[in-house]
């Protein structure tokens, strides 16, 4: 980590330090902004004290980041077009980084101040889109290319549909609990609010088994949040470092000799595959282009040329430190290009399952060179997220716990909301899909209460929906405006 500050230009080192500070601030805000969702149900059902719930949530957020992998992280990195990320000069890269971070932080703090559980994920993704769009307008390039449409479509679909899925699943769980437990003795207890239990039975705490279920489901939400949102923080920091300190982060400089040889072997196998299937792929390309606009730039001969260039670049290389900065840029570009081509090849109609499995594995293997994160990055993101969880959580907790439904949550509603959220976010993290913890859990709470017939507070739902609708466009406009102003300032000075 210390080599980041070894630049001869003191200003550059200071800017890197400031960028790191901004990213960690964003992640800490994410902690107390989003993780409040995980502790709100515990606190308002009196399953644990507020302090215990927050500390426990912070701990499992930390573990979620450490053990969650990197699939979501690089879904965030790839939202920014590669040419913008790799071709920016240092001043433009700094403008891009600070505009993006400032926009996301300002919106997150604003919604937190007004007690609105808005999505940190939406604000980050919106800020990245704003940079890409503004750059396209300034450089008079394609807006479609600036949006990286295939990646953007997948992210948008996940962010839009995940709350709907949360509402439906949570409501269904309430229905199932009522159906299967109606003949059990004391089944009514799970459908009581803490206040009702205190008034009827004189006890403040939930029954033991219900308490354990609430704690475990809350742990699940915290861990899943760390795995998904923590990965976004890792992706954001890698995006920043690739932009302003590319020499050390374009490729994994810590890759072992064995790993590099494995990458080279994978490239060789891909060359053999494409050479062997030349006629089939060229024929299928012509047919596929008639029905699939996304592969209009697919060219078999360009793929072969790219593979040959990669093979040549890696000749006699057993340590990526042997590559100079230009060669590292080229290697990253070649591997990303090849990865996109593999994705397109997989969707050809005459590619059999065995070939698809080979191509998917090959893509995963070559991306290990560029889709990585040093352990110190994972650790500081985990620490920032967990520390953020332990401060500033009260404002959002009040909204989730008291203002969504017309009455306080029952134990069953809390459990169904948390189980839904932990499963949904966990699956999304495993599959590399960035989702919003805030929207999944708040919609799960609403779904549980609607299923129970308790009703919801329309005014609060309107405010949450308004924050949901505004987050993307506002963060897009903010980051785009900041980027434009910063570039003007750089140009004039």
UniProtKB/Swiss-Prot annotation:
It catalyses: phosphate(in) + H(+)(in) = phosphate(out) + H(+)(out). The gene is pit. It is a multi-pass membrane protein. This is Low-affinity inorganic phosphate transporter. Pfam families: PHO4. It comes from the Bacteria. One of its GO terms (cellular component) is plasma membrane. It is found in: Cell membrane. Its main location: membrane. The keyword Chloroplast does not apply. The chain crosses the membrane at residues 13-33, 52-72, 94-114, 124-144, 155-175, 207-227, 233-253, 373-393, 421-441, 470-490. Belongs to the inorganic phosphate transporter (PiT) (TC 2.A.20) family. Pit subfamily. One of its GO terms (molecular function) is symporter activity. Low-affinity inorganic phosphate transporter. Keywords: Cell membrane, Membrane, Phosphate transport, Symport, Transmembrane, Transmembrane helix, Transport. GO terms for biological process: phosphate ion transmembrane transport.
